[in-house]
């Protein structure tokens, strides 16, 4: 029999746990204003906590992003939800990123939502490029076949 040491979770600050996560995490209020971001979110969005907490999600994420409607739905339903393969674009960083976005209401708060962003892997990006390349080859093949038929 082994003697397991059980850690007293009350002694661990929640902020330290959130800061230790490698994925970007944000806490939003009911108006989608940013209340907290962890270090990974600061790196992801290219801005500090003090800059980000002066903004709302609408300021940070491109207009019409499914992330905004995801957060609205989580607030309305009081239930966690996930969006997969979302394009995360912003004027703050140049390239669009593909990510899975997890949002959950924070219990015992008035409409606050925790949002975790998990960027998709390089393999997904390569897969998309291969699909595009295959489509381009199909179009090129079709064009050469039509040119041959017209010639005959």
Which residues does each predicted region cover?
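Hydrophobic pocket-lining residues within nucleotide cofactor-binding pockets
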Residues: 21, 28, 57, 106, ...
């Amino acid at each position: 029999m082994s003697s397991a040491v059980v850690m007293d979770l009350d002694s661990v600050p929640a902020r330290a746990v959130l800061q230790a996560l490698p994925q970007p995490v944000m806490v939003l209020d009911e108006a989608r204003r940013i209340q907290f971001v962890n270090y990974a979110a600061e790196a992801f969005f290219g801005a500090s906590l003090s800059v980000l907490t002066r903004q709302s999600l609408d300021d940070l994420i491109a207009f019409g992003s499914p992330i905004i409607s995801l957060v609205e739905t989580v607030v309305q339903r009081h239930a966690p939800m996930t969006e997969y393969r979302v394009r995360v674009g912003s004027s703050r960083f140049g390239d669009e990123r593909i990510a899975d976005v997890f949002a959950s209401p924070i219990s015992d708060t008035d409409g606050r939502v925790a949002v975790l962003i998990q960027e998709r892997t390089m393999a997904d990006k390569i897969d998309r490029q291969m699909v595009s390349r295959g489509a381009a080859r199909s179009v090129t093949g079709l064009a050469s076949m039509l040119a041959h038929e017209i010639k005959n």
